[in-house]
Regions:
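Feature activates predominantly on carbohydrate-active enzymes
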Residues: 102-297, 305-307, 313-325, 347, ...
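Flexible, acidic glycine-rich loops studded with aromatic residues
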Residues: 369-372, 380-517
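Flexible loop/turn segments at secondary-structure boundaries
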Residues: 60-61, 182-184, 210-216, 266-272, ...
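C-terminal motif of bacterial Sec signal peptides marking the signal peptidase cleavage site
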Residues: 2-4
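Generic beta-strand/beta-sheet core signal
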Residues: 55, 177, 205-208, 260-268, ...
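Contiguous, structured surface segment used for ligand recognition
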Residues: 7-10, 14-169, 461, 473-513
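Gly/Pro-rich turn-and-neighbor structural signature
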Residues: 305-315, 319-389
Length: 517
């Protein structure tokens, strides 16, 4: 891939069932839908005379410009010549930071495509990056292939339009479970690339669970030398060294994706308990487990060594992640009393804050005394909404809408269905603002699609359950509620098929969608 997206798989032939009516081909293939869009007559044609003007030496802006130039080269065979900053000559594509665009927020942008020129402005490098992703979706899908597919330059057109765009929510996230099954650095980088394409900006990594511990902790090396060696089913696991994890954090940051590390505490900890028996109340290491049962494990909350362990783990991971968050889990703890659980979470909250991070936890932590900076991630459809509504900050991941490891239907080979069957329409048609009655409007930070990996052995499995539902969640998180429409989304997501195919994405061809060739 280009500068904003690392690698492009080899081209794949379109699925033989992929068809599209002419109405689907006429839509603008933009997902998520921009906040404001006006179509105009005409189009801008990219030719060998087209130039690229970049009015900033900011490193992130330059990366976005290189990505755009590479996408143009792949889709047309044309190498854009550089033009002086601010050049307004016919045939110019210009990228410019503009303080007057601050009204669009930290991630907004304005894009004007006219027959004579293309202008992209934003107040921040992030805004320009997201504007480039919009242009990317308007370019031919051949821009996603790693090699130019033709010998002679082939002009391409961009439809004339005017877009002013900004996200509805600041938190537009995805969670990837690398604990039940391990995914390599390259796999996770690919997922980052796909998130960035769809303007998502958080990747929550579930780094430890009963079946495996996936990040090196130098003060507790047995966590990975023993606890990181397997996964669900007993197949070989793996882990990230601290250098690898730091590299992943940097890779994501270049694409305006913040990595949110999670170490689930005090439950979901059998991999840690089997590595260090002193973390158990009886001092005996349990056998490693590779099944998918939950709720049976817990750190010994009455031992001082437990909190030394947590402080060391949080400290080492916090040093690797410049983002402000640390996810401490807190879910499905069935072996503690409510009072034990409450005291534990509040003590962990203090540790996390001491390392300069905001604590995030699954919605069970709403029953404890939380600091105003702490964040509750709502996931249980049957959770007490009155309790959740009092949370100082909320991330919404309702399992019956946003758990994209659920099956699409009863025939889906992968995934689970304990929360619900989630066809694409169900992932799309919900309003975060009304999900938790009584929650303050400013308490809802945004939305996160969770992908647990009990049934997923490789990235093709991940992509099959993620797409197209991840695109639906991206639009729920970005686009204004009043602009969203299922039938309109059906046409636009169907138009993504050539791009996803070029990227090698193993997406589910939902039967309710007319997939473009």
């Amino acid at each position: 891939m280009a500068a904003g997206c690392a690698r492009t798989p080899k081209p794949q032939a379109p699925h033989p069932a992929a068809t599209a009516k002419s109405s689907a081909l006429r839509v603008l293939p933009l997902v998520p839908l921009p906040a404001s869009l006006e179509r105009h007559d005409g189009a801008f044609t990219i030719t060998p005379k087209t130039t690229l003007s970049v009015a900033s030496q900011d490193a992130a802006v330059q990366r976005s410009a290189r990505q755009l130039a590479e996408l143009v080269r792949r889709s047309t065979g044309i190498t854009l010549a550089s033009a002086p900053p601010g050049a307004a000559a016919d045939g110019a594509i210009s990228l410019r930071l503009d303080d007057q665009q601050k009204s669009l927020g930290a991630e907004g942008y304005e894009l004007t495509i006219a027959p004579q020129s293309v202008s992209l402005t934003a107040a921040t490098p992030a805004g320009l990056f997201y504007g480039v992703q919009t242009i990317r979706q308007l370019l031919p899908a051949s821009s996603e292939y790693e090699a130019v597919l033709f010998q002679e330059p082939r002009p391409a057109t961009l439809p004339a339009l005017h877009i002013r765009d900004w996200p509805r929510f600041a938190w537009r996230g995805a969670m990837l479970d690398v604990a039940r099954h391990f995914f390599s650095v390259e796999d996770v980088e690919r997922y980052v690339d796909l998130l960035a394409l769809h303007k998502m900006n958080r990747l929550h990594l579930h780094l430890a669970d009963d079946q495996g511990w996936r990040i090196e902790i130098k003060k507790w090396p047995g966590l990975t030398t023993k606890g990181g060696q397997s996964e669900v089913g007993g197949t070989p696991g793996g882990f990230y060294t601290q250098a690898q994890f730091a590299g992943l954090v940097s890779y994501a940051a270049d694409r305006f994706v913040t990595i949110v590390p999670e170490i689930d505490l005090p439950g979901h900890t059998n991999a840690a308990l089997s590595s260090y028996p002193e973390l158990n109340c009886n001092g005996v290491a349990p056998s490693p487990r590779f099944d998918t049962e939950v709720g049976y494990s817990s750190l010994c909350v009455d031992k001082d060594v437990t909190y030394t362990f947590i402080d060391d783990v949080v400290g080492e991971i916090a040093a690797l992640t410049p983002g402000p968050y640390f996810h401490a889990g807190g879910d499905e703890v069935k072996t503690l009393t409510p009072e034990q659980y409450k005291k534990f979470i509040e003590r962990v909250q203090t540790i996390v804050q001491a390392h300069g991070k905001q604590m995030i936890g699954w919605d069970e932590i709403a029953a404890t005394s939380l600091h105003l900076s702490s964040i509750v991630q709502h996931w249980r459809p049957d959770a007490a909404k009155s309790e959740i509504s009092r949370a100082p900050k909320l991330i919404l991941s309702p399992a019956d809408r946003a758990y994209i490891d659920m099956k699409y239907d009863d025939e889906t080979a992968l995934g689970l269905k304990w929360a619900a069957l989630i066809p694409l329409k169900n992932a799309y048609e919900w309003n975060p603002a009304t999900l938790v009655p009584g929650a303050a409007a400013d308490a809802v930070l945004g939305v996160e699609a969770a992908l647990w990996s009990e049934t997923l052995a490789n990235m093709r499995d991940v992509e099959f359950l993620a797409f197209p539902r991840l695109a639906a969640i991206a639009e729920v998180a970005w686009s204004p509620q009043e602009r969203r429409d299922w039938d309109d989304f059906r046409a636009r997501v169907g138009a993504q098929a050539p791009r996803w195919t070029a990227l090698g994405v193993n997406f589910f061809r939902a039967p309710e969608i007319e997939w473009a060739r």
